[in-house]
From Swiss-Prot:
Glycosylated residues (UniProt): N30
CDD domains the UniProt entry points to: GHB_like (cd00069)
Lineage, opening ranks: Eukaryota, Metazoa, Chordata, Craniata, Vertebrata
Gene3D superfamilies the UniProt entry points to: Cystine-knot cytokines (2.10.90.10)
Function: Promotes spermatogenesis and ovulation by stimulating the testes and ovaries to synthesize steroids.
MF (Gene Ontology): hormone activity
Designated name of the protein: Lutropin subunit beta
Residues spanning the signal sequence: 1-17
Cellular compartments annotated: Secreted
Superkingdom classification of source: Eukaryota
Family, per entry: Belongs to the glycoprotein hormones subunit beta family.
Disulphide bonds in the chain: C26-C74, C40-C89, C43-C127, C51-C105, C55-C107, C110-C117
């Protein structure tokens, strides 16, 4: 009887939880980022598409001798790269900056080769140079 009650509780909870999380699911969103080069006089902000949102995860309730369960992160599924030119760079300095543009996203393991797996930043734009705002790349 206890097994049946536990199964019923978990199945109803799963149905309720699947109706939609409180946070948006993993998806492409518009974000403003910054690009700069130490040799160029200005920093440029630009709008692009990144992956962000909630990925369902599980945590063991009881301590176990097993390794922790890997937690999925919102990461790129399909992407392409775009480039912008930093103005005012001196001769001999490459003024081009390339960045990924998310076409679609998925929940999966964190791969440091193409994702920033950290949490939210206190300051999303961090320019050491004077700011030249307003470029849009989607």
């Amino acid at each position: 009887l206890q097994g049946l009650l536990l199964w019923l509780l978990l199945s109803v909870g799963g149905v309720w939880a699947s109706r939609g999380p409180l946070r948006p699911l993993c998806r492409p969103i518009n974000a403003t980022l910054a690009a700069e080069n130490e040799a160029c006089p200005v920093c440029i902000t630009f709008t692009t598409t990144i992956c962000a949102g909630y990925c369902p995860s599980m945590v063991r309730v009881l301590p176990a001798a097993l390794p922790p369960v890997p937690q999925p992160v919102c990461t790129y599924h399909e992407l392409h790269f775009a480039s912008i030119r930093l103005p005012g760079c001196p001769p001999g300095v490459d003024p081009m900056v390339s960045f990924p543009v998310a076409l679609s996203c998925r929940c999966g393991p964190c791969r440091l080769s193409n994702s920033d797996c950290g949490g939210p930043r206190a300051q999303s734009l961090a320019c050491d140079r004077p700011l030249l705002p307003g470029l849009l790349f989607l």
